[in-house]
Amino acid sequence: TSKISTTYEEEGRQSKIQPRAFVITRSGPTSRSSSYSARQSYGSRSSITPGVYQQLSSSGITDFRGTREKEKREMQNLNERLAGYIEKVHFLDAQVKKLEAENEALRNRKSESLQPIRDAYENELAQARKVIDELSSTKGVSEAKVAGLQDEIASLRELIGTYENQSKDYRKKIESLGNQIGEYEGELHTLRIRCGSLEDENAKVRELLDKIQDQNRRLRADLDTETSAHIEADCLAQTKTEECEFYKDLLDQLELLKPEPMQIKGMDYAEFWKSELSKCVRDIQSAYDEKIDIIQQDIEAKYSSQINSLRSGNVKDGMQLQHVQEEVKKLRTQAGEKNAAYAELAAKFASLQAERDAIGRQCSELERELEELRIKYNQDIGDLSNELSAVLAQLQTLTDVKITMELEIACYRKLLEGEESRVGLRSLVEQAIGVQGRGTASLKDTIQQS
């Protein structure tokens, strides 16, 4: 292609626009019922009819001046707009001359041979069509591959949803097991508190039993002491009885061994000693018997009272001891049952913890595998998306090149055909732009459908 440059000299061109004259008629203030007319040409020429100044007052003069200034500004604006229109007309005339020169240059180039250019463009078009066909086949394979990958992604998403539902079920089961473990721990804590209270009561009962046993031991020691004292008293009484018997035997022997009584005049000494000795022995015996009786009565009363108290205390202590033994036995039975239940709960708790740990490990393993699969398929999707974007970019580039070539070929074809209708460059450009817009729209529709 060749570029033709034209210059436009505004000074040597005669403008066909003639100066225009404007006639403006203004009505004066209504209060004065006066009117005036102004005639202004392009040279700003004005005239006022005589006799008008005589009818105007000072306020009318002020209004007239303001109106006059306003009219002047309007005329200046109109003159500026007119000058702008004139400049536009000059520019359009220059453009027309430039286009006419370019058209004349193109008509003069008809004799030149454009066959090599046409062949080159046809070869490029053939190569572009071949590349487009190859890209279309590659696009079909890529679309099939993408569809397969999308199906695989959908199946993997379903599998991920299944795993997520299973993990939710496992989490709910873990929460329920944790709540059950908490209930068991609360019950176990209650049982421990109950066992502690029962152990405290058992310790108190043991202390009471120890006190009762100490009291029994003290009472038994007192009983042994009283029994030994009673035995000693019996032994003492037996000794005194034997002593009395000894004294009786001694007296009898003395009576047998005594000499013949001396007869004192007026007094029988045998009878005297016999009566005195018998009296002394009787006094001693009576005093000893009284003392023995008093001691025996005291000992018997004390012994009987102690025996009665011991018997009543033993009965009461025996009942209390039996009750305490029954209570201790019952508490031991309950403690054994609670220990068995505690052992069972501890075993169950350990099994539940082991099951929870196993489920947690399984969930973490599934989550890890799921995350790895997700990362892998996201990478595959990203790679395929990048590849598809690159293919679409190449296809769009080739399509743009094809459309550009077709437009250039169409332009050269019209130039070579030599139309005599003298179509301007503007119509050719508009037609080319319309073809390019239609090609771009068809390419966009094709890309969206693919």
From Swiss-Prot:
Q: Where in the cell is it found?
A: Cytoplasm
Indicate the principal place this protein occupies in or around the cell.
cytoplasm
Swiss-Prot/TrEMBL keywords: Acetylation, Coiled coil, Cytoplasm, Intermediate filament
Report domain IF rod positions.
71-423
Q: Where is the composition biased (Low complexity)?
A: 25-47
Positions of region (Coil 1A): 75-106
Region Tail: start-end pairs = 424-450
Report the domain of life of the source organism. Eukaryota
Biological process (GO) annotations held by this record are:
heterochromatin formation; nuclear envelope organization; nuclear migration; nuclear pore localization; protein localization to nuclear envelope
Q: Where is this region: Disordered?
A: 1-50
Q: What does this protein do?
A: Epithelial intermediate filament protein.
What family does the Swiss-Prot or TrEMBL record give for this protein? Belongs to the intermediate filament family.
Q: Describe, as the record does, how this protein assembles with itself and its partners.
A: Can form homomers.
Query: What name has this protein been given in UniProt?
Result: Non-neuronal cytoplasmic intermediate filament protein B
